[in-house]
Amino acid sequence: MTDVDHIIIGSGINALVAAALLSRKGDSVLVVEREDRIGGCMMTEEVTLPGFHHDVMAATFVLFLTGPAYGALGEDLAKHGLEFCHSPHPTAALRPNGQAL
């Protein structure tokens, strides 16, 4: 196994921000996740329509968008495709039958 400077267990938003900031300063980072996808509660999935992605467990991104992590990483994240869709109706509850509240 290759030596790394930091091993981070889990891949939720805090872990990924820590990994990105450590990597940006030149440290080597290994993120270990037990699930088959990264993101924790920030995971994005196609739930309703093909091509329309939902952040299924995230209630709000306000703390991230207004915090220092987004200030430090926002431009890099945008280069990799991150964009936010702002709406007057930012939340919904999807029912198993396809209806939404």
Enumerate the language-model features and the residues they cover.
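N-terminal glycine-rich phosphate/pyrophosphate-binding loop and immediately adjacent elements
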Residues: 3-101
